[in-house]
C-alpha cells in the first residue's frame, strides 16, 4: 500500500507558492461586425487608440482609423479574405513600425518592409515608426549643399539642395519618372542613399525602373518600396511612410538620402477610397478634409539636420500627375504649397521633342542659388534670363513678318540654348560637362552651328576635354569655382574644336 507523506506534499506546495508570480494578461478585444472592401467594423476594443495596430485571429493586421461611439473602423493591411463576421480581434498596443537597416540596400520591398524580389529574407534588428514626427526647427539648418541631378536644365536653373522638397509635376507620359531615375543614377560615387517609392504603378513599370537601376549599377545604393496598382488601398497609403522611415534611418546616421515618391496623386486616391469606405465626410473632389495633412506630415520629414545631429539630410522629390496640365486642381495645389519649389513638365514640349520636357518659365526652386556651387552660379546666371527673353520674342515672332537683325540673332541664340538643354535618358552629365555646355552657348560659340549639330559637337567637345585637357575637370571638382584658368582652357579649346568639327561635317 502506498503511503502518503504529508510533509513532502506540503513542502512541494510551499515551494510552488514561493515561485508563483502573479501575472495577469489584460487583452483589449473585440468582435468583427462587418467586413468588406478592405474595411472592418469591430464591436468592442473600448480602449483602442487612433492609429493602433489591430490583430485578427487568423493573423491579418489592420490599423484603427475611425473611433466611433458604437464601433471601430479598421483598415486592413492585406486582403483579409479569411476574416469572418463574429471573429475575435485584439488590440496590440503598438503603432505600425517597420524594420530598418543597411541590409535593405539593393532590395525591392513592399509597404510592410517584406522583400518581394525573391532574394530571401532581410535580417534587421532595428525598427522605426512608419509615421515618425518630423525634425523640429532647432533640429534643422538652412540648405547649402547641392544635390546634383545630372540634368543640365535643373542643375543650372532650378537647383536642388540636400534637404529640399522639390515637386516634379506634369501630365502622364511627360517623363516625370525619367527625371527621378536619372537623379538616382547621378548619385553614383556621391555617397547618397536613394529610396524609390512606387505607389499604384503597373508592375511592368516598376520592373523597368529596377532593371535600369541594376544595369547602371545604381541598385546597390537604392531601396525600392513598391505597392502595385492591384495592392490594397491601405498598403498604397502606407508605402510612402515606409520609404520615409527607411530614409530617416540613414539621415539620423549622418548620411545623405534622396527619396522619390512616384506618385502622391495615387496615394491621395487610395486615402480617398479608404476614407469614403469608412464613411468620413467628403470634401473638395471627394477627398477627405485631412488630405493636406496626409502629404504635409510626409514631406515635412525631409530635412537638412543641424550640426548637433550630424548634418545628415533627406531630400524629397515627390511626383504629382496633372490632368491636361491643370496645376490648380486640389492635390497639385496642396503639394505645391508644401514643397520648396516645383519642376513642371509640359506635354507640348515633350511632343515637340524637347526632352526632358521642363518648362523653365514656370518651374522654380525656392532654395535657389544657395544650392549651387560657385562655378555654376558664375556661368548659369544669364541662362534663365536669355531663355525667358527668347520665349517672349519667339511668341512675338509668330505674328511679325520681318524682324531686325538683332532680334533674329537673339532668336538664333535662344534656339541653340534650348537645344543644349536636351538630354537623352539615363545619361546624366557631370558638373564640368554642364558648365562647358552652358559657357559655349552663352558666349555665342554655338551660333554658327546648325541646330542638329549641337548635341554631337558638345559630346565630341566633352570627350576631347576629358582626354586632352583633364585639368578643366580637376579645377571644377577641386575648387568648385570657374577660375580664370578654367575659362582660358575653354576659350582656347572651343574655337579650334569647332573649326575641326565643321571641317569634318563638310567632308
Curated annotation (Swiss-Prot):
It is a peripheral membrane protein. It is found in: Plastid membrane. Signal peptide: none annotated. The keyword Transferase does not apply. ATP binds at residues 170-177. One of its GO terms (cellular component) is plastid membrane. GO terms for molecular function: ADP binding; ATP binding; proton-transporting ATP synthase activity, rotational mechanism. It comes from the Eukaryota. The record marks 363 as: Required for activity. Pfam families: ATP-synt_ab (PF00006), ATP-synt_ab_C (PF00306), ATP-synt_ab_N (PF02874). Keywords: ATP synthesis, ATP-binding, CF(1), Hydrogen ion transport, Ion transport, Membrane, Nucleotide-binding, Plastid, Translocase, Transport. Its EC number is 7.1.2.2. It is an enzyme of class 7 (translocase). It catalyses: ATP + H2O + 4 H(+)(in) = ADP + phosphate + 5 H(+)(out). Produces ATP from ADP in the presence of a proton gradient across the membrane. The alpha chain is a regulatory subunit. Belongs to the ATPase alpha/beta chains family. F-type ATPases have 2 components, CF(1) - the catalytic core - and CF(0) - the membrane proton channel. CF(1) has five subunits: alpha(3), beta(3), gamma(1), delta(1), epsilon(1). CF(0) has four main subunits: a, b, b' and c. This is ATP synthase subunit alpha, plastid. The gene is atpA.
Amino acid at each position: 500500500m502506498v503511503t502518503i507523506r504529508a510533509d513532502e506534499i506540503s513542502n512541494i506546495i510551499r515551494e510552488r507558492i514561493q515561485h508563483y508570480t502573479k501575472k495577469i494578461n489584460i487583452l483589449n478585444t473585440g468582435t468583427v461586425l462587418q467586413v468588406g472592401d478592405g474595411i472592418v467594423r469591430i464591436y468592442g476594443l473600448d480602449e483602442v487608440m487612433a492609429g493602433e495596430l489591430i490583430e485578427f485571429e487568423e493573423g491579418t493586421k489592420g490599423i484603427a482609423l475611425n473611433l466611433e461611439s458604437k464601433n471601430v473602423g479598421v483598415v486592413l493591411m492585406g486582403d483579409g479574405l479569411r476574416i469572418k463576421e463574429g471573429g475575435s480581434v485584439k488590440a496590440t498596443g503598438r503603432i505600425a513600425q517597420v524594420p530598418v537597416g543597411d541590409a535593405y540596400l539593393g532590395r525591392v520591398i513592399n509597404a510592410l518592409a517584406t522583400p518581394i524580389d525573391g532574394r530571401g529574407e532581410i535580417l534587421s534588428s532595428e525598427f522605426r515608426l512608419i509615421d515618425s514626427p518630423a525634425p523640429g526647427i532647432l533640429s534643422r539648418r538652412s540648405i547649402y549643399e547641392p544635390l546634383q541631378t545630372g540634368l543640365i536644365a535643373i542643375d543650372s536653373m532650378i537647383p536642388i539642395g540636400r534637404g529640399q522638397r522639390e515637386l516634379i509635376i506634369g501630365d502622364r507620359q511627360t517623363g516625370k519618372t525619367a527625371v527621378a531615375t536619372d537623379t538616382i543614377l547621378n548619385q553614383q560615387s556621391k555617397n547618397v542613399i536613394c529610396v524609390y517609392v512606387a505607389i499604384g504603378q503597373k508592375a511592368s513599370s516598376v520592373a523597368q525602373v529596377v532593371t535600369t537601376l541594376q544595369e547602371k549599377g545604381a541598385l546597390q545604393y537604392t531601396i525600392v518600396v513598391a505597392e502595385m496598382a492591384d495592392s490594397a488601398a491601405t498598403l498604397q497609403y502606407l508605402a510612402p511612410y515606409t520609404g520615409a522611415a527607411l530614409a530617416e534611418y540613414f539621415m539620423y546616421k549622418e548620411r545623405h538620402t534622396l527619396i522619390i515618391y512616384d506618385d502622391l496623386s495615387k496615394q491621395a486616391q487610395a486615402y480617398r477610397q479608404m476614407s469614403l469606405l469608412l464613411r468620413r465626410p467628403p470634401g473638395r473632389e471627394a477627398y477627405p478634409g485631412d488630405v493636406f495633412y496626409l502629404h504635409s506630415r510626409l514631406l515635412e520629414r525631409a530635412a537638412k539636420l543641424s550640426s548637433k545631429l550630424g548634418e545628415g539630410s533627406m531630400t524629397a522629390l515627390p511626383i504629382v500627375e496633372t490632368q491636361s496640365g491643370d496645376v490648380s486642381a486640389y492635390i497639385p495645389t496642396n503639394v505645391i504649397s508644401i514643397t520648396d519649389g516645383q519642376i513642371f513638365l509640359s506635354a507640348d514640349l515633350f511632343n515637340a521633342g524637347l526632352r526632358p520636357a521642363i518648362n523653365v518659365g514656370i518651374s522654380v526652386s525656392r532654395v535657389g542659388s544657395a544650392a549651387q556651387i560657385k562655378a555654376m552660379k558664375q556661368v548659369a546666371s544669364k541662362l534663365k534670363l536669355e531663355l525667358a527673353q527668347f520665349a517672349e520674342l519667339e511668341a512675338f515672332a509668330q505674328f511679325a513678318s520681318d524682324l531686325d537683325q538683332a532680334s533674329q540673332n537673339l532668336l538664333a541664340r535662344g534656339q541653340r540654348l534650348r537645344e543644349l538643354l536636351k538630354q537623352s535618358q539615363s545619361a546624366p552629365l557631370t558638373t564640368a560637362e554642364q558648365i562647358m555646355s552652358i559657357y559655349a552657348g552663352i558666349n555665342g560659340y554655338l551660333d554658327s552651328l546648325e541646330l542638329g549639330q549641337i548635341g554631337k559637337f558638345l559630346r565630341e567637345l566633352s570627350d576631347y576635354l576629358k582626354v586632352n585637357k583633364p585639368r578643366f575637370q580637376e579645377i571644377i571638382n577641386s575648387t568648385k569655382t570657374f577660375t580664370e584658368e578654367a575659362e582660358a582652357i575653354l576659350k582656347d579649346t572651343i574655337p579650334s574644336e569647332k573649326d575641326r568639327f565643321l571641317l569634318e561635317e563638310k567632308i
